[in-house]
């Protein structure tokens, strides 16, 4: 009897919901032309207006921040049927299929959003259209990022996720819960080699070490401790042999990984952004995945310099990085990094000459996190007042350097708050970056289109199904990385590799000195 009553109530509820949905879809349409003109565009949140959007992005749902009792929205373009929505609340949720069809049919065209709001007096007000350009260039289908809490030193729920940018689907890549609650970070994907990825892990629990570099190559997943593959005297300071790999970059051939070995510590200020990080020592080296060996050269592991943030040119002929003169921690605000590069021949292993691309004395700022565009024309980097940890620098801005002319400029898309970690799409027409522009505390991911001349469009916030999502989401997005394919290994396989001994398939590997001679 109770079961029949429950089923009856459930059926009634479903019927009412269905009727409500039907009525919502079939409410009388609004005559936009007859509505009174507001003579201004509507206020919406997130601010998806006057920008360029990817043709393959998920629907840009938004809130209409105008008081009213009824809302009508029409989204249209030159080709195809417009999307018409009607709601008694300000949430605008766009149907996925119709959105995709509209954007795909109108690549390179404008997208117009018309909004009408009915006030308490029953009268409709029509706002000026919001117009965005639909790019002809697609953005990469996937975005990788780490989600962390904005705390100082406790590793709580440190997870790396991947998001399908065509939808709202988010899936776990790896969680620190799979190996005792340590740290997982610095995920790096190989350009043109979707089956390859690395990430770094840190942690010791109950006498078990989870420290190491997880290397994924075409189905094989293993943990490597780069410290065991280098002689302690490889560099004058031996930092490569003492510190684990940190920031890294795959060579375009997918066989070599440049990485930094850093000795850093966190400290705190009394006011403002209280968190900060100081780099006491850092060097660069190469991990050769096929041979399972590590090599370096004195020019990238000097005892009188700090070298970090490696980044390859798309042809693999140059390794870009940041370099600074070390100073005591009491002088941390005097540490400013130069932008450097050095030639490299992957076929012979020979190094070229060291070159200063852009000195900090010229900019007056610390230059970090260099990333070269896929066509080799542009270099995107961060500049901040000092140091090598721009995510904690409110002064951090994005700069674009023309590698042909060596001219650089501060991008117009920067905010008064921290704009930091960034990457390029595979086609070089989009950048993704982390920004704290909303509140100064939580970093969110934004996208901007970059045209052939280096002009960058107004940033687009990573869309969510619920347009009010970011108002209550209390985690920060860290290290956004675009990718053309999903993660090449399951979270279970990555967890097994993290928990495995770090020697594993690396047992018996030996250090190899670099070939003598330099590039001509």
Where in the sequence are the language-model features?
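Sequence signature of WD/YWTD-type beta-propeller architectures
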Residues: 5, 16-520
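N-terminal Sec-pathway targeting helices
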Residues: 1-13
């Amino acid at each position: 009897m109770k079961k029949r009553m429950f089923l009856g109530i459930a059926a009634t509820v479903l019927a009412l919901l269905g009727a409500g949905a039907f009525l919502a879809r079939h409410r009388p349409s609004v005559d936009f032309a007859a509505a009174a003109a507001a003579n201004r565009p509507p206020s919406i949140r997130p601010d998806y207006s006057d920008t360029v959007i990817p043709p393959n992005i998920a629907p840009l749902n938004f809130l209409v921040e105008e008081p009213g009792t009824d809302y009508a929205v029409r989204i249209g373009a030159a080709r195809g049927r417009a999307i018409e929505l009607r709601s008694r609340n300000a949430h605008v949720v766009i149907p996925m299929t119709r959105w995709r069809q509209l954007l795909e049919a109108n690549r390179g065209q404008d997208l117009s959003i018309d909004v009408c709001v009915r006030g308490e007096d029953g009268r409709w007000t029509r706002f000026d259209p919001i117009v965005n350009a639909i790019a002809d260039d697609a953005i990469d289908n996937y975005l990788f990022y780490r989600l962390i809490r904005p705390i100082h030193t406790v590793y709580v729920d440190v997870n790396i996720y991947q998001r399908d940018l065509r939808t709202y689907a988010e899936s776990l890549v790896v969680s620190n819960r799979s190996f005792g609650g340590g740290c997982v970070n610095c995920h790096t994907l190989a350009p043109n080699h979707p089956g390859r990825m690395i990430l770094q892990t840190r942690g010791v629990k109950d006498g078990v070490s989870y420290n190491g570099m997880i290397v994924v190559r075409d189905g094989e997943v293993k943990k490597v401790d780069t410290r065991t593959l280098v002689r302690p005297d490889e560099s004058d300071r031996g930092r490569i042999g003492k510190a684990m790999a940190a920031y890294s970059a795959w060579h375009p051939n997918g066989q070599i990984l440049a990485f930094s070995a850093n000795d850093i510590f966190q400290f705190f200020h009394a006011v403002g952004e209280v968190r900060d990080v100081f780099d006491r020592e850092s060097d660069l080296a190469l991990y050769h995945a096929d041979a399972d060996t590590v090599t370096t050269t004195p020019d990238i592991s000097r005892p009188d310099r700090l070298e970090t943030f490696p980044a390859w040119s798309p042809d693999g002929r140059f390794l870009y990085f940041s370099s600074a003169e070390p100073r005591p921690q009491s002088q941390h605000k005097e540490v400013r990094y130069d932008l450097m590069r050095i030639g490299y021949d992957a076929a012979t292993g020979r190094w070229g000459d060291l070159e200063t691309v852009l000195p900090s004395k010229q900019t007056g700022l610390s230059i970090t996190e260099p990333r070269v565009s896929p066509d080799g024309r542009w270099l995107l980097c961060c500049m901040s007042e000092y140091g090598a940890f721009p995510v904690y620098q409110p002064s951090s801005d994005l700069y674009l350097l023309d590698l042909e002319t060596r001219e650089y400029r501060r991008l117009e898309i920067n905010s008064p708050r921290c704009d930091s970690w960034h990457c390029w799409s595979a086609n070089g027409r989009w950048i993704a970056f982390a920004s704290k522009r909303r509140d100064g505390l939580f970093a969110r991911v934004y996208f901007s289109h970059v045209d052939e001349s280096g002009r960058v469009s107004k940033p687009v916030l990573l869309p969510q199904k619920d347009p009010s999502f970011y108002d209550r989401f209390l985690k920060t997005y860290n290290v956004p990385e675009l990718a053309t394919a999903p993660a090449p290994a399951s979270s279970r396989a990555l967890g097994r590799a993290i928990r495995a001994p770090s020697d594993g398939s690396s047992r018996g590997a030996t250090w190899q000195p670099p070939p003598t001679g330099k590039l001509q």
